């Protein structure tokens, strides 16, 4: 992984950062690369309440905020920005609202790399709305000044439609911390982390690949095809 001037990560929910890009985050923060994480909601409408349940619909908001702060501390993120949008409603925000928020962050931080979801290939409506807003915000920047957009994709049909990933970050050395960050999101991954650890120790191919390598697609802005 090359050094970056500043890395901006934009995801909609607490745990997206730990589930999708924890190793990549650690690779940057442990080299003291400036990194900002913009989390648009606190995932308060999530269905998971812990296993066994310890959260309620009323308490989940505060619990997930604490989990997010714990996880980002583990990942070495010093600049966490919680934007306070309502979970599961991002697709219904006023047109241009999310784009403007992201534009302001880009103008302030001048990142060389932005990481978010690949719009249309990230399964959840909030994921797709976030990725679309990031793409729209970055598209307003002239190509020679635009940061690279690393997009995360995992819809069932994604490789058939957008091809194999352009980048696969090798993050084996960060697996223990990656699992620790996931464990911090206890309301969402209480039993999953135990299962992942067991599968990793047993050498389950899919789990080893998921924990040790993080794939990204470089988002294709239309002006690149001119």
From Swiss-Prot:
It is an enzyme of class 3 (hydrolase). Zn(2+) binds at residues 13, 16, 127. It comes from the Bacteria. Signal peptide: none annotated. It comes from Bacillus anthracis. One of its GO terms (molecular function) is metal ion binding. InterPro entries: BshB2, GlcNAc_PI_deacetylase-related, LmbE-like_dom_sf. Keywords: Hydrolase, Metal-binding, Zinc. This is Probable N-acetyl-alpha-D-glucosaminyl L-malate deacetylase 2. The gene is bshB2. It catalyses: (S)-malyl N-acetyl-alpha-D-glucosaminide + H2O = (S)-malyl alpha-D-glucosaminide + acetate. It holds the Pfam family PIG-L. Belongs to the PIGL family.
